[in-house]
């Protein structure tokens, strides 16, 4: 139900504009199918923390079946992917999973997700291209 309340990006142009026009906040985009279970779970977490992170993060969702433009560029083969951008730059985060480009697993704790977003934002403000997650998700590695 959370995805209903989160802003949807309905075209490649909308995704680009969300990434390019946000000057001060971190842009968090959940890519995936709105009907996928893992997307629904992540959307609930993102919706529940949206008000708490509004000062430093803008959260969006993008249905990859509706907007396939970025599937190849961002390697969006997973059912659910969360990516971070700051001032038109892709932010990478080391979660201990081996894939630093994106989060392709569900974080089921609200405070953990807030901490991750805050860590990525702080690293982005310091011009770090890669930040280390405050939590190790090695056990959530997707083969």
UniProtKB/Swiss-Prot annotation:
Biological process according to GO: cell division; mRNA splicing, via spliceosome
Q: Which UniProt keywords apply?
A: Cell cycle, Cell division, Mitosis, mRNA processing, mRNA splicing, Nucleus
Q: Write down the CDD domains for this protein, in alphabetical order.
A: DIM1
Query: InterPro entries per the record?
Result: Dim1, Thioredoxin-like_sf
Record SMART domains? DIM1
In terms of domain of life, where is this protein from? Eukaryota
Q: Which Gene3D superfamilies match?
A: Glutaredoxin
* Compartments (UniProt record): Nucleus
Q: How does it assemble?
A: Component of the 25S [U4/U6.U5] tri-snRNP.
* Family designation: Belongs to the DIM1 family.
Q: What is the recorded name of this protein?
A: Spliceosomal protein DIB1
Native organism taxonomy? Eukaryota, Fungi, Dikarya, Ascomycota, Saccharomycotina
What gene is behind this protein?
DIB1
